Design a protein with these regions (language model features):
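Conserved Rossmann-like nucleotide-cofactor binding loop
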Residues: 11, 34, 251
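Short beta-strand to alpha-helix junction loop
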Residues: 102-115, 137-147, 187-206, 317-323
């Protein structure tokens, strides 16, 4: 088959690899000048079932509302639109334990399959992308312990491998933790991973090129046309394919809406910063996450990446206070 893939991030690149490996003729389109230039560029890099827990859970609405009156909160509204409020209303309809458990179990199945595919791909292609093993979640007090329990309850049901640690045990796993930071407990996931998503995507791009994948960068897809031979409409031409796979992140909704497909998406943003490791003894061995503030620190080779501060809204201008 002749297949078009819209988006050259990690989702688009892994899709291109799988299809090209099965001898399909693959073309990848992206509006940027290279792969992994947007959502795959500098995310936390953490691969964890715990981090995949649905945000729609009991107390989420209050967390967002109360965050408007705090100097720092894990989640806040920022230049929102009415569309964002409609999304939050739908999300609030699932803020109960039954919906949370059902949705989380489905996400775990998907992430388990994804993790198995990643391990197989890494083994077959011998990819090195600054990966590390293990994920430590810090609980500052009993309130953090209580908020994490619904997630752990589902993880226990599906047989996920994790351990509840004391403060002393947590510091043995991550000796660089600040001794002045209070730790009530910690949750350790030995099978979780962290890695450089952009580096992984670029490595896979090289593999795809060897398999004959055609890349069209700086090519914005204006629209898609359905039919027996779907068309990808660019600014100056239209190209026909047997199938089209849309991996364009938030831009996917605008491309699919004219075709009658409405994706339940809204815009969430987060901040991240990367820094070189000057003294390995002062850096984490893998990834550490603060449960209360949802801020993570990941070890990526000779660098660390700090990420967090979720904001709902489409304001792409960085807030200076968030960078100070």
């Amino acid at each position: 088959m002749k297949v078009a893939i819209i988006g050259a991030g990690v989702a688009g690149m892994t899709t291109a690899y799988e299809l090209a490996s099965q001898n399909h003729e693959v073309s990848v389109f992206d509006r940027r000048g290279s792969s992994a230039e947007e959502g795959s560029f500098a995310n936390s890099g953490i691969l964890s079932h715990y981090e995949n827990a649905p945000w729609a859970r009991a107390g989420m609405g209050w967390d967002i509302f109360s965050g408007a009156f705090k100097s720092y909160t894990a989640t806040r509204l920022q230049k929102w639109r009415w569309h964002d409020l409609r999304w939050l209303r739908k999300c609030a309809a699932n803020n109960n334990s039954d919906s949370f458990g059902e949705h989380f179990r489905q996400l775990i199945k998907l992430s388990q399959y994804s993790q198995a595919c990643l391990q197989q791909l890494r083994q077959n292609l011998h990819l090195e992308y600054d990966q590390s093993n293990g994920h430590l979640v810090l609980l500052r007090d009993e309130e953090d312990e209580f908020s994490s329990e619904p997630v752990l309850e589902v993880l226990r049901e599906v047989g996920s491998n994790f351990k509840i640690l004391s403060e002393q045990e947590a510091r043995l796993i991550e000796p660089a933790l600040n001794p002045e930071t209070p730790i009530h407990q910690a949750i350790y996931f030995p099978e979780d991973e962290a890695g450089n998503c952009r580096q992984f995507t670029l490595l896979l791009k090289g593999v795809c090129e060897g398999l004959g994948v055609n890349f069209h960068f700086n090519s914005t897809v204006q629209a898609l046309q359905a039919g027996k031979k779907p068309q990808v409409i660019l600014r100056d031409q239209s190209l026909s394919f047997d199938a089209v796979v849309v991996c364009a992140g938030l831009s996917s909704a605008a491309l699919l809406k004219p075709l009658g497909i409405k994706l339940p998406q809204t815009t969430w943003q987060a901040y991240s910063i990367s820094a070189s490791v000057r003294e390995p003894m002062d850096a984490p061995k893998s990834s550490v996450m603060d449960e209360r503030y949802k801020v993570s620190i990941s070890r990526l080779g000779q660098r660390v990446r700090i990420s967090g501060a979720r904001e709902i809204g489409d304001n792409t201008k960085h807030q200076e206070v968030s960078l100070s």
